[in-house]
Amino acid sequence: MRTERTSFLLALGLLVSGFCSRVHCLPENVTPEEQHKGTSVDGHSLASSNTDFALSLYKQLALKDPNKNVIFSPLSISIALAFLSLGAHDHTVTEILEGLKFNLTETPETEIHQGFQHLLQTFNQPSNQLQLSVGNAMFASEELKLLDKFRKDAEAFYASEVLSTNFKDSEAAVKLINEYVKNKTHGKIEKLFNDLDVLTNLILLNYIFFKAQWKTPFNPNHTYESEFHVSQNERVIVPMMTLYLETPYFRDEELGCTLVELTYTSNDSALFILPDEGKMQDLEAKLTPETLTRWRSSLQPRLIHRLRLPRFSISSHYQLKDILSQLGIKKIFTSDAGFSGITDDHKLAVSHVIHKAVLDVGEEGTEGAAVTAVVMATSSLLHTLTVSFNRPFLLSIFCKETQSIIFWGKVTNPKEA
C-alpha cells in the first residue's frame, strides 16, 4: 500500500518530506533543565567533533568544484542537524550524530544537545565588541501537530520559536520565511527560497549573523588595485588591502603553506592560510583537526612589514543532500527515516538540505551570515617579512571562547561574488 508523503524542510537550511517511526528525544521523566544541571558538557569534545565535521564537509565541497570559491558555516549546519536529531530515533538519530562526528559511546545524546544549548547561550551573550547572533526557528504547517515533548526540547535546547505557516499558499509562505531570514541576517541573505514544494509541512531553520571589527584595521587609503593569480593562466584585478602589523604567524614547511591570524576587537580571529603555488589540493587532502590544532599552537607573534590581503565578498548556495549522504547521513532522506518524535500524525523524511552563506572581508573587519593562540619571536626583527595573499587561499573564522569554526572557506577568485 502506497503511503502519502509530506514534506519537511530544514533550512540552515534543511528541507524534509514525509515518513515515520518512534522518535527518541529525551527520557520522559527528566526535563532539559534538570539534565543541564546534572551533567557537565565537555566543550572541547563538542568543538573537536564540529571541527572534524567542518573539514570533512569542506573536502567534499572543494572536490565537487575545485576551482570555485567555497564559503559555509559548519556551525550552522551542525546545529540544524543536531536540532533535527531531537525528533529522530534508533538508527536515524545514530546516523545523524555519528555523521556529525560524535562518538556516542563517549558522549551521550543528551550531552550533545546540552553542548549545543551552552554554545547558543554563549554566542548570544550581548557584546560591544562583536555582533554574533545564532538562532533556530520552526515554520510548521497549520495542520501539523507537533508533539509537546519535541516543542519543549526544541525550545529548551535550541531556543527555537514556532511560526504557524500556511504552506498551501506557497507564495505567502516563501515571503514569510525569506523576510524572517533577511531580518535575522541583517539583510545579508535576502532570499533563501524561490518556491516551496506543495508537500512542505515543516521547516527547521538555523541562522547565523557575524560582524566584527579588526583589532588593527586596514587603512582604506592604502588599498590599491593589484593582480590576483586565480590560476597559472588567469589573473584578475582586485582591491588589495595592505597593513604593517605584528600578528600571529606560522610558516609550515612540512605542508608548504603560510599562516597569518588577524584578531578582532572581540579577540575572536580569522586565520588565513596561503598554500605555496600549486599546492592547494595537496594541502586540502592533508587537512585534519590535528593539523588545525598544530597550526594554532605554532602561531607566534611576528612583525609583518607588508601584509597584502584582497578585499572580497563571496557567497554560496548549496544543496547538501548528496554530500551529507557521502558523509554517512543517508537514512533521513529515505522512507526508513524515523521522525515520529516530531509528530505522530505524519510520516516524515528529509527531501533537501539547503545552506546559504555570505562573507564580506574589508578594511574595517568581517561581516558574514549563514542560514544551515604566544611568545614573542626574537627572529621577527631580523629581516623584513611580506605576505601576499595574491593567489587562492583558505580562511577560517574562529570563536576562541567556544573553540568553534563559525565560517570556513576558500577564496579562488575574489572577483566572483
Curated annotation (Swiss-Prot):
Glycosylation-annotated residues: N103, N183, N221, N267
Pfam families in the cross-refs: Serpin
Assigned keywords, A-Z: Cytoplasmic vesicle, Glycoprotein, Protease inhibitor, Secreted, Serine protease inhibitor, Signal
Major location category of this protein: cytoplasm
PROSITE patterns to which the protein is assigned, alphabetical: SERPIN
Any one cellular-component term (Gene Ontology): chromaffin granule
InterPro entries the record matches: Serpin_CS, Serpin_dom, Serpin_fam, Serpin_sf, Serpin_sf_1, Serpin_sf_2
SUPFAM superfamilies: Serpins (SSF56574)
GO molecular function: serine-type endopeptidase inhibitor activity
Signal sequence range: 1-25
Coiled coil: none
Cellular location(s): Cytoplasmic vesicle, Secretory vesicle, Chromaffin granule; Secreted
Family statement drawn from the similarity comment of this UniProt entry: Belongs to the serpin family.
General function of this protein: Serine protease inhibitor.
Subunit structure: Homodimer.
Entry protein name: Serpin A3-7
Source organism: Bos taurus (Bovine)
High-level lineage: Eukaryota, Metazoa, Chordata, Craniata, Vertebrata
